[in-house]
Amino acid sequence: MLKHADNETLTRTGPGTPLGGVLRAYWQPAALVSELSAERPVKAVRLLGEDLVLFKRPDGGWGLVSRFCAHRGVDLSFARLEARGLRCLYHGWLYDAAGQCLEQPAEPEHSRFFEKVRISGYPCAERNGIVFAYLGAGDPPPFPAYDCFTAPKEYTFAFKGLWECNWLQGLEGGIDPSHVSFLHRFLDADPREAYGQQFSEEVEGTGTKLSQLVGDHYRPDIEVEAAPHGLRVYAVRQLTASVKHVRVTNLLFPNAFVVPFGNAKVFTQWHVPVDDEHHYWYMIYYDFAEPTDSETLLRQRLAGVSLPDYQPLRNRANNWGFDPREQHELTYTGMGLDINVHDQWAVESMGPIQDRTAERLGVSDRAVTANRRLLLSAADAYQTGGKLPARPLDQAAASGLTGPLAVDTIAPSESWRQHWRDREAERRRCSPWSGSEWSGSQWSGHAPGRGTGA
């Protein structure tokens, strides 16, 4: 359990809060590129409790500014998009991508008043289908060389979804390796097609889908280690006397996780506060072996949401589609075949902000407790001007933040620690875009242990 004050620290992310300051010190997803129309690429965005407007400039760059005009407070998401920025409809004030006012047409011709007027403006950068924004102080850090950023676009796919709960609930679900044995279990054979469906591929060398394997072996040995990107999490299941199943996942500090999607596929997923009671998850899926079938992936995911807000069709208002008969005959949850809905139910059912003073954590929660300690330490460091984890200060440091390694594999019991790394190295050697020249901090690390967990 947490102290009430610590829970408040971890869940409050608006302007001026310690954890909000931590999140603002990193690049955060602001929108999917596909959300902005070619005809008028302007979109209202609420991010970390701030109301903003995202727009694409004629030169291809991006601007992110306060949603409200400094003059009389009207909504700039309806502004005219011009070559130099956004022009307010009310009195014609023009703002550039940095939020600086450039023109005030109704003021006297000789007036320089516009030079004194500025609204909030934040740097933006586009990476593999997502527009990222930096809301922190000073210059933004360089982007790390993580796989999700360096993979060629044709090998990636990006999407998002709205969850009606605090951001930390979503993130903690993603770094909890034991829930998959229950929440995502099928009572009989998994009926889903493999492509694009998490846990539906066969685990290489077993002939068994991952959903069945983790369901049959529901008591993994969980180990957590510190890593340059945050945390590395091992869930090791004993299949036979001589063979283990090894699943390696990651916390990408401060608010993302990286998990294997199949034998050649991985995804990185951020949990980004809209405000303290709502957040979006953003995903970049990438394939080491072949270009993605983006049309299929998009069709699968659009079938479960309503636009333009990416609100899941299964939600609290309809009990997440709960079907008692299905729960008896097909799925552990009774909430359909989409694993993302299962995760959504788990974290939304806790309420808008989970009361962590009332929870009881066990050994299987090692990754959750390690992450909370890391976040609280970072909040303290932010307030005292200390160093934040996994935040590169220069390009050399950013280039050293690679991977992270995320893999599902079977391994000899005695040598699993080395075997999974060999398996990952082979996957990269065979990859068209992450070949044998790949190297980085991910190959080194502390031996997995339990000291950072519960």
Report each predicted region and the residues it spans.
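A short, structural micro-pattern
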Residues: 24, 118, 125-127, 265, ...
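Short beta-strand or tight-loop elements
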Residues: 26-28, 48-50, 120, 229, ...
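A boundary/linker detector
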Residues: 1-27, 31
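Rieske [2Fe-2S] iron-sulfur-binding domain
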Residues: 16, 32-157, 241-244, 271, ...
